[in-house]
Regions:
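A cross-kingdom feature marking solvent-exposed beta-strand/loop segments within repeated
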Residues: 28-44
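Short N-terminal "domain-start" leader segments
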Residues: 1-18, 22, 29-32, 47-57
Length: 59
């Protein structure tokens, strides 16, 4: 049985917040690529991504 896709937030070894997007099959499809200094900032990055992706062009 598949799980729902999700954003996984975590603190890395340097103490920075990061995110991963996990697909329904459990595989990581994307990650933040950079660390954030607070939970608020990582949440803001996730919300920006969720808002912008529907209008993203395939190039």
């Amino acid at each position: 049985m598949a799980n729902d896709p999700q954003f996984y937030r975590y603190v890395d070894l340097r103490g920075e917040w990061r995110w991963r997007f996990i697909a329904a099959n459990g595989r990581t499809m994307a990650d933040s690529g950079e660390g954030y200094d607070s939970l608020e900032n990582v949440n803001r990055a996730i919300e920006t991504l969720k808002r912008e992706v529907p209008s993203a062009r395939l190039t």
